[in-house]
UniProtKB/Swiss-Prot annotation:
Together with bola2, acts as a cytosolic iron-sulfur (Fe-S) cluster assembly factor that facilitates [2Fe-2S] cluster insertion into a subset of cytosolic proteins. Required for hemoglobin maturation. Does not possess any thyoredoxin activity since it lacks the conserved motif that is essential for catalytic activity. The keyword Ligase does not apply. One of its GO terms (biological process) is [2Fe-2S] cluster assembly. This is Glutaredoxin-3. The keyword Aminoacyl-tRNA synthetase does not apply. The gene is glrx3. PANTHER family: GLUTAREDOXIN FAMILY MEMBER, GLUTAREDOXIN-3. Keywords: Cytoplasm, Iron, Iron-sulfur, Metal-binding, Repeat. Residues 1-108 form the Thioredoxin domain. GO terms for cellular component: cytosol. It comes from Xenopus tropicalis. [2Fe-2S] cluster binds at residues 150, 252. One of its GO terms (molecular function) is metal ion binding. Homodimer; the homodimer is independent of 2Fe-2S clusters. Heterotrimer; forms a heterotrimeric complex composed by two bola2 molecules and one glrx3 molecule; linked by [2Fe-2S] clusters. It is found in: Cytoplasm, Cytosol.
């Protein structure tokens, strides 16, 4: 089931959903005119190789309008997740790391997520506190920084980017409970909302004023360039392994093999899951001029991939290389 299937009609779509039995089915509602959809098709093709037990389906949203309307798909890309012919999750927008996360989560689960009545909900105020403190600067907006879904959100993202502010965001269109609850929690009725260190700064107009006065510049951390970020990551620990998955669970055969070798050396090392961050995944290939994963670094310098690690192990040099003796 490694290939991405295509549903060209409502009947074909229904048949694919019904035939998938208890396995996970991920449907990408896409459009050929949207470049972000083409990019996400490539991500799906990669995921199909990594998750052969999952069925991946492409459906051109405008070509099969009855299915798009049934599931209230109004923009592309949109991803729907099905099990036992029932929709269990939805993801709007081109968010490769989040798509990867959700596929992994649902693929590893053999049952449906708990229904709202079967388990107590996390206290909403507690959840909102966690969200507004999720990063030093948090923007609650419609859409994502890559794909804002209203003019005000687009303007505030442009302002923050112009000021090189490092911020994280939350798409309030993806969670109605957060969307309504945050209005009351912060006594602020509109979006976007910008928070610094868990405190509400305000909306677009206030952020504009703070940019003009220079206050925002003093208040918010500056975003690193990708090169600066990659340099910091490869130097995060003396020995850094960039892989698919983590120490507890490798998500490809090559990563699994290199973990076994590393664990047998007794040398302390840290890992970074490249499936969690598409920017790092692609950027590190160019940064180190090394096109594949896993990649192993010692003191910020690339050692190589699995084949080189195997060679170093066979020659008896691996431990001394990992300890920085060579």
């Amino acid at each position: 089931m490694a290939a991405v299937l295509e549903a060209g009609s409502a009947g074909q779509f229904e048949q694919l959903i019904q035939n998938s039995a208890k396995s996970l089915t991920v449907v990408h509602f896409w459009a050929p005119w949207a470049p972000q959809c083409t990019q996400m098709n490539e991500v799906m093709a990669e995921l199909a190789k990594e998750q052969p037990q999952v069925m991946f389906v492409k459906l051109e949203a405008e070509a099969v309008p009855e299915v798009s309307e049934k599931y209230e798909v109004t923009s592309v890309p949109t991803f729907l997740f099905f099990k036992n012919s029932q929709k269990i999750d939805r993801l709007d927008g081109a968010h490769a790391p989040e798509l990867t996360k959700r596929v992994q989560r649902h693929a590893s689960s053999t049952s449906f997520p708990a229904t709202p009545n079967s388990a107590p909900k996390e206290d909403l105020n507690g959840r909102l506190k966690k969200l507004i403190n999720a990063a030093p600067c948090m923007l609650f907006m419609k859409g994502s920084p890559q794909e804002p879904r209203c003019g005000f959100s687009r303007q505030i993202v442009a302002l923050l980017n112009d000021q090189k502010v490092q911020f994280s965001s939350f798409d309030i269109l993806s969670d109605e409970e957060v969307r309504q609850g945050l209005k009351t929690f912060s006594n602020w009725p509109t979006y976007p909302q910008f928070y610094v260190k868990g405190e509400l700064v305000g909306g677009l107009d206030i952020v504009k004023e703070m940019v003009a006065s220079g206050e925002l510049d003093q208040m918010c951390p500056k975003a690193q360039s990708l090169e600066e970020r990659l340099k910091a990551l490869v130097n995060k620990a003396p020995v850094m392994l960039f892989m698919k998955g983590n120490k507890e669970m490798a998500k490809c055969g090559f990563s699994r093999q290199i973990l076994e070798i590393m664990n047998n050396t007794g040398v302390t090392y840290e890992t970074f899951d490249i499936l969690e961050d598409e920017e790092v995944r692609q950027g590190l290939k160019a940064y180190s001029n090394w096109p594949t994963y896993p990649q192993l670094y010692v003191k910020g310098e690339l050692v190589g991939g699995l084949d080189i690690i195997k060679e170093l192990k066979e020659s008896g040099e691996l431990v001394s290389v990992l300890k920085g003796d060579q």
